[in-house]
Every structure is written in C-alpha cells, then in structure tokens.
Amino acid sequence: MNEKYAALKSNVSMLGRLLGQTIQAADGDVILAKVETIRKLSKSARAGNQADRELLIEEIKNLPNHQLTPVARAFNQFLNLTNIAEQYHTISRHCESHVNELDAIGSLFAKLAQKSVSKFDTAQAIRDLNIELVLTAHPTEITRRTMINKLVKINECLSKLELSDLSPKERHKTERRLEQLIAQSWHSDVIRQQRPTPLDEAKWGFAVVENSLWHAVPEFLRELDEQVKSYLGEGLPIDARPVHFSSWMGGDRDGNPFVTHTITREVLLLSRWKAADLYLTDINELVSELSMTKCNEAVRALAGEEHEPYRAILKPIRSLLQETIEILDAKLNGQKLAVKAPLQTADQLWEPLYACYQSLHECGMGVIADGSLLDTLRRIKAFGVHLVRLDVRQESSRHAEVISELTRHLGIGDYNQWSEQDKIAFLTTELNSKRPLLPRDWQPSPQVKEVLDTCKIIAAQSKDAFGAYVISMARTASDVLAVHLLLQEAGCPYRMDVCPLFETLDDLNNAESVIRQLMNIDLYRGFIQNHQMVMIGYSDSAKDAGVMAAGWAQYRAMEALVKVGEEAGIELTLFHGRGGTIGRGGAPAHAALLSQPPKSLKGGLRVTEQGEMIRFKLGLPEVAVNSFNMYASAILEANLLPPPEPKNEWRALMDILSEISCNAYRKVVRGEPDFVPYFRQATPELELGKLPLGSRPAKRNPTGGVESLRAIPWIFSWSQNRLILPAWLGAGEAIQIAINEGHQALLEEMCREWPFFSTRLGMLEMVYTKCSVSIACHYDERLVEPTLRPLGEKLRAQLQQDIKVVLNVENNENLMQSDPWGQESIRLRNIYIEPLNMLQAELLYRTRQSELPAPELEEALMVTIAGIAAGMRNTG
C-alpha cells in the first residue's frame, strides 16, 4: 500500500488483529485458521495467481454448513472495521489533503477572490445558502442501530489512540476498550431478525440526529462564521439557517402499506418528543453555566428581581420542556389527552434565549454568549420543535382513486375516465369553491379513507411539522392539483409544498410542459405563493433507460424547469432523489453539484440522503461537518461561478449518445429473452426479497418482472455479484459508436471543458473499479444453467470493451488515476469483499438445492449480503 496511507493501514491491521483475537476466543482456532487461509488465498488470487484461485474455490466448497456463518461474519466484520478506519482517516490529523478538502470554504473564497467575484455578491449568496438534507430509510440499510452506536464508540477510541502524549496506562486502557467493543459487535446480531417497522426506521433517523447532526450543525456554523468573517469582514447573522433537515421515515407511503396515517401521527409525536428531550439537555447545561448576575434592562424585565437573572429565565424553559416531554410521552403510550404539549413553536425557546444572548453581549460577556448559548440558538433555527420536518410521499394514482370514487358517488361520472382538460376544469372549479366537496353520507373504501385520513393529519399540525407532499409517478398537471384539493378539503390552514416527482425517461422529458401548464393557471399561481418545488427522480429513470440517457434527461429537465421558473417569475426548488449508487444518481457530491445546469441551485439544494449514505456522510459529527462544508462550497461555487452553458455541438452529440445508449440498454434488459432468467440466477435477487431489511416490499407489484422491481433491489442485486450492470450498460457502447463516426476530438473536448460530461465519465470509472469480471464469472459458473451463460459472457466482454473506450476518451492509462484516495479505498475493501462474494455464490448454490434451506445457510447468506453491501459502499 502507498506509504502515504500508513496511519490508515496501521489502524486497519490493529482492528483486524483485535478481531482475530475475538474470533479465536469465541469460535476457536479452527475457525480463525479457516478465515486466515481464505484471506491469504483471496489476496493471492487477486494478484493473479490462478492456482490459488482454484484452491480458494475448493476451500469454500468444502466448508461444512456450520462453519459458513462464522467465516462470513468474520469478513463482514473486517469490512465494517475497515469502513470505520477509513471514515476516521478522513477526519484524523494524519489525513492527506487530497483525501479530504479540509478547508473547502477557504479554498472557494481564494478562488472567488482570484476571479474577482464581488464581495457583495458573495455575501448575498451566503445569505441565500439553503441546504436541506432529506433523510430517507433505505430498504438495504443493513446496519442496525445497535451496531451504529458501537461504531461511534470505536471511532472515539481511534481518536484517543492518535494522541501522541497518551501515557502507557491510558493507551492500554483505550486498546482494552476497543477490544471490548469489537467483542460486543462480534457477539451481537449483525442482521435484524425481523423487518424494521416504519417506526423503527424513524428512530434510526432520530439516532443519527442525536449522535451526530445535533453536534455537527453548531460546529459547522461556527467554522463557517469564522471564515465568512475573515473574508467579508462580518459573520453570519445569528438566525442563519444554511442547513436543515427533513425526513421520509414514517411519511413515505409510496408502495409501503405499513406507513399509515396512525404511523405518521406517531412519528410526528416522537420527533417532537426527541427534540424536547435534546433541548432539555442543552437548557440544563445553560442553567449550570449562566450564573452571571449582570444583565440589560430587557432581561431584568423578564427575570424580575431575581439575583441570577439568566437562571431565572432558563428555569421556566426547563419546566416547559419537562411538561412537553411528559405529555408527549403519555400520548405516545396511547393515553387520550385533551391537553396539548405546551411547547408549540420555536419562538417560545428562541425569544427568551435570544434576549439572554443580547444581554450578555451588551454587558461585556460576549465570549460567554458565543459558547453553548449560541450553539443552542443555532440548533433552534436548524431543528425547530420538530427536529426534522416530515415529508409525505404517495403515488399519484392513489389521489386520482379518491376523486374517482367521489365523483362516482356524486353521480357525475368517473374522474379516472375523464380527459386531462376535464380533470383540470373540475379541480380548479372545486379549488375555487367555498362549499365543501366531500358529502357527509359518503362511506369511502378503506384505501381512499387512508389517503383522506393522512390529509387530516397534515391539516391538524403546524406548517413547521412538514416539508413537502411528494407525488411519485407524477405525469400531469391534474396530479398536482388533486393533492392541493384534497389538502384543502381536509381543512389544511397553510400552503404545503406539493412536489411532483418525475422519475421515468418520458416523465422527465414532459416535466417542463406539466409545470408550464400549471403556471398558466392563475388560481394555481395564487395558491403556491410564488414557490414551486419539483423532484427529479434518479433511480427509476436509470432503471428505465440506463445511466447515460437518464443523466442527460435529468440535466435537460432541470434546465427546462429553471427556464420555466424564470419566465413565470417564481422561485423554483429542485429536489434531487439521489441514492447511494451511480445507477441511482449517487456521485461524489461536490462534482455532482458542479455538473448541474447553470442556475439550477439558485433556489438552494434539497437532496435525499439514504440509509447507508447517511452513515458514511453524516454518521459522525466531524464527518457531517465536512459534508456540510462540501455541500456549501459546491452550492456557492455553482451560484457564483456558474459552469458554462453547453455548446450546441455538445448538446447535439449528447442527444445522440443518449439515444444510442438507451437503445443498447433496453436491447439487453427488455429485448434479450434470456435476460430475466439470467438475472434471477446470477444474482441474489429472489433471496433478497426474503430478508428483513427495510419496512417496504421489494416489488411494487408482487407478480411482475424486472419492470415491477423497485429501483433499489434492482441495483442492489447487481452490485452483489459485482457486475453492477445498471450503472454502466449502454454508456460505453454509445461512446464507441460516436468515436467510430468521427467524434473523438469533440468527446475529448467535452471531457475537458464540460463538468456534466466529465462527471459522468468519472462516475463510470468508479463503477468499473468496483466491478469484478472474475467474480461475476464465478457466480455464472456456480449458479447459472449452461444455456444462459453466453449472455453473461457477452455482458462481461462488453464491460471490458467499455472500460477501454472510457479510458481512451479521457486519455488515461488506468481507472481512477486522478483519484488515488478513491482507488485506494476500493482496493482496501476488495481484499475482504472477494471472499464474501465466493462464500455468497456457494451459499446461493446450496440454498437453491432445496425447497426449505437450512436456517444456518439463510443466516450466512444474509451476512454475506450485508458484508458485500458494506464493502461496495453505495449499495442501492
């Protein structure tokens, strides 16, 4: 390994050694010896030793069933520990500058000064900075909350061990603690035994807020404030809220029958309870800190004659929080209380605390004001009284079904059979009407009642409790108007952001005309108060058309929507539904944001962060601060130094590449008669459905083929066997055809000068690096019937051909040569992933031999799936 990663290497080997000791103590020498043999053979096989490769396959074939789980768990744990060491390395004092831009904002300010961007414009852009991260449950977030807490503690130990002035006694104590944590992880269940409920998923999200984001937000704002102050001469306003959070956990009912209006209500109560609980800790700390006696008149008026005025103000806040917690607790435990929790708005906390803050500054105690008190004020702005705002997501057909059932009941026809024009006419008339639409004697079907009950829950809460109402599979203007009407009928007293999600290739191409149509309805313009949110779906478009065509459709849709927004004079927020993987839009955030169309980040950034990516990007306070810095610097750069408008010849070539790649992708996925049976045999797709991973079923339609599979299991399955097909199929082929037609020079120019195109190629390189032709081939040999194998050979040959094509256009010798850290990080994990792949192929072979496989085989299989997911990083 490269000498410059010596600190990381030594942490990985120390954690590996401690894990080895744990395995030996728990499972004996035999298992440890097996693990070591497999690790060494795998390393040698990776280096190209064919004889050792054969030995490795035999070694795994000969493992008795009862040894499979401990061996699989060993490699799974190695990977988790490697991930921890790597994540820690990015925030450690030994971290190299190319690994992590430690001062992204500072570098940006230097660039702005060099390009003579006015300080006035910079100040304006900082004031408008708006990053909203939307936490979503991930059906494949395999790490349990129990494990996540242990990972945080392991990180703390690594941090302690890095201190050079640690006494031998302290060092020994920390190493001992590390050993205990690794042993605790080894003896805990890596995998959930039951599917998590939507409530479990929401609690997982709250754990991330409590363990990381709660600490990261004030820290990030403190750093940003200092940098802004030194560059512009004045810091951030005290009520700045550049970063805040929403969540889909407990609100996303699209295809998830387990998320009901009762669950949503419970999650809303739980998030308020958790917020009050966290503020109570803050207030208790402030009560002990703010013992000062000197204050200004405003605080004196609030505190009366009390000797310690600040404490006099804080104590009633403490009581308010305690009472809120008690009432919410009772409601969560099913008690029917008529009384409301006293803490209703953020101002109840903000106003008295801000008065204390001003008083401390006026009385010469600014240094005290700018400590814990300022942190709490920053949190109040970022988290409010709801901690995270809840998005509600539902599929468009469910809203149409409500109105259709209603119009049939009223005897005015079937809404679902009407033309789009008639639907719009009906909806706008009703939105304009003062009389209620829902008759009292109407008994809706249970499905329809559920949608109406959800709208009532929204209407009963304050506006701050919710983010957006997202309509999945949105196709028409009536899809958006229908939701506004249902919310109005439920008596919703505020305007909620109703956000259409355009997710297939056709829907992305039609997004502009749908929004334009809405903007031409005067009533609608008044309704939305000049603000429209639109969500761009990454996963379904890539599944539908392949990454190259989907990426270009997303770009063009964003560009067109920005134009519609400008023409209509409305503020547009684009909401990005990215996943962790390339096939679902996941790219290194900084590069991805800078490759978006000019002006597309003017309304700020709203982006989903999913399960396992939440853990990698936001799971530790220091890592979260880095992520916020990266997002902030990318948005500021995109808005202050916008990327060039693409040249017409770039666009024309992109149109061609998009069409060719889409056809090449669909020719295989839809047109190849052997494709579905091959996919089912070569990947663990069928087995994945049985795993207790997320609360949501893996298919929208339980009987359908590939098209009915959700985008996440579709990509997840392919990343398990290391072919990662959806993330590259079609792209290289299209580029090769363009080269054959004489476009090599133009492609090279696009690669050099157009961030959109160079980012696409960079993402492909990362996927190619994670693919393994030899592993994918091994799955075929072990699992696929001989008549289907030629398809696998064809796909692997295409992959190898595509890699050469992309390197040729980039004028590169090797994959990821411009990203040595990314390359190293993948290399480091591959050492442990490959044995897991070999084990998984063997386990799939054994479980498919019988109708009722032994439970120990299924458990071992789940461990390999979890391990490979942890190793591949962006699982789905």
Swiss-Prot record:
Residues forming the catalytic site: 138, 543
E.C. code: 4.1.1.31
Short name of any one Pfam family annotated for the protein: PEPcase
Enzyme class: lyase
One of the record's GO cellular component terms: cytosol
Catalytic activity, reaction form: oxaloacetate + phosphate = phosphoenolpyruvate + hydrogencarbonate
Annotated GO biological process: carbon fixation; oxaloacetate metabolic process; tricarboxylic acid cycle
Keywords: Carbon dioxide fixation, Lyase, Magnesium
Known cofactor(s): Mg(2+)
MF (Gene Ontology): magnesium ion binding; phosphoenolpyruvate carboxylase activity
Family assignment from sequence similarity: Belongs to the PEPCase type 1 family.
Annotated function: Forms oxaloacetate, a four-carbon dicarboxylic acid source for the tricarboxylic acid cycle.
Name the UniProt record assigns to this protein: Phosphoenolpyruvate carboxylase
Gene behind the chain: ppc
